[in-house]
Amino acid sequence: MDIFEKCYAPSLAKELKEAGVYPYFHALQSRQDVEVQMEGKRRIMLGSNNYLGLTIAPDVVEAGIHALERYGTGCSGSRFLNGTLEMHLELEAELGKFLRKPGIVTFGTGYQSNVGIISALVDRHDYVICDRENHASIYAGCQMSYGKMLRYRHSDMEELEKCLQRVPEKNGALIVTDGVFSMGGDIARLPEICALAKKYGARVMVDDAHGLGVLGQGGRGTASYFGLEDQVDIYMGTFSKSLASLGGYMAASEEVADFVRHASRPFIFSASIPPANCATALAALRHLEQHPELPERLRELSLYARKGMTDRGMKIRESALTAPTPIIPIYTYETYHTLEVAREIYDRGVYVNPTLPPATPEGEVLLRTSYMATHTEALLDEAMDIMADVLVKDHE
């Protein structure tokens, strides 16, 4: 059998392209902003993870330019060898102070961070326990580890406790959860998770990719939002969302961080974050520290959008109705209908993300919308009017 045979077989992607509703790989001709030029037309951007709008902040852009001029385009090596810049150490030190965790390890991407952390810490004697709606990179890390994975229904604390009860006393256990769930926009039930972890002697890791810059004191994230910074053992996060760059990190105790530095194959055998990305992440972090009003503005706009959508008759996923996060999923139920309305909304000048399984639970299809602190109410009204026109009036 030819290993490429699967490549020539019929697929959903081919069907969608033939039907004219294929929703992926639209090309931008502009910066990532609240309005973009995409395929030659102005479109309101409601699909970006640029939550604080810092990809175009002058101080962040200038930091990237300066790093390119000083260090060149890349580090040409692993952090383990020739790929560590002073700037990497500076970023890790400043991030550690901001997150109040002394041990920071930076990775090339957020995906790589989850894979690298979990595969280093979880061995064949350990259990890793996951919310079913965790990000795909968490599951990739679990698969790369030699541990036993248990999953519990989304935010179901009774089922989490049953999973913990299955772990023998002689084995270690790591509970891993998104802080803010990337598709649903809801927040993990962290107080209950931490209480159960304490009861059963487990450790807690929070993927805060969508929580940093969004929740908590000064944007410190989900644990800060709940006042549980001392009870979460590991934070994982990215530089590609609120911090307007590329890369990821782990924040933990210095002992745990040092172990991961020396045991994580994705960290050891990958090139380090390029100079421009390192510099822009550091500049964005400093910008956030200097402008603590940005997360609050983001929350205001997110609540404004939730109310505006509900008032216009759009059906928001129940778990996200009151969450103070910039991710708002709209139910659309059926795959082809979702792709058709997403295309119509796009043609009318608004970019949103149609979200299908496996990114969502089986049987659940959504339009994922997301917001920036630099949006305006007027721009959101324009976008919501267009979406309501398509989703409510045209499809009643």
Could you describe each region identified by the protein language model?
Residues E296-L303, T310-G349, A359, E364, ...:
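Conserved PLP-binding catalytic core of the aspartate aminotransferase-like
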Residues I3, P58, E62-H66, R70, ...:
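PLP-dependent enzyme catalytic core of the Aspartate aminotransferase-like
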Residues E5-T73, A202:
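N-terminal "arm"/small-domain region of PLP-dependent enzymes with the aminotransferase-like
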Residues S272-H291, R297, T310:
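Structural motif of enzymes handling amino- and sulfur-group chemistry
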Residues L150, H154-V206:
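Active-site phosphate-binding strand-loop segment of PLP-dependent enzymes
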